[in-house]
Amino acid sequence: MIRVFIDPQLLIFKMSGHSEFGPVGSDIVCAAATMLASTLVHNMTTRLDESQILERELNSGHAVLKVMPIRRKMRDECRVLFAATLEGFELLAKRYPEHVIID
């Protein structure tokens, strides 16, 4: 099961586990979760200076992202992107509740 924690206010994202929905390399739930996580990490790394990325890890079965934008406007933009990612994971969890859980 994939477990996800996202706090759009604190700008923290954590994901762990495997969905075990299908065979490795053909698992659509895992692919969807990976794309959501990868898109969030990409958006943060292209918008923020390295000094504002407190933690970043994206591996098979594990992802962590913590950011602290300095400017208020950028913080607000990041919160929107974190919230959109949370919404994506909520939709995925609704469709595949045995394979994705939001903490």
What are these language model-derived features?
Residues 1-28, 41-103:
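N-terminal intrinsically disordered, cationic/polar leader segments
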Residues 29, 33:
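Short, conserved glycine- and acidic-residue-centered signature motifs
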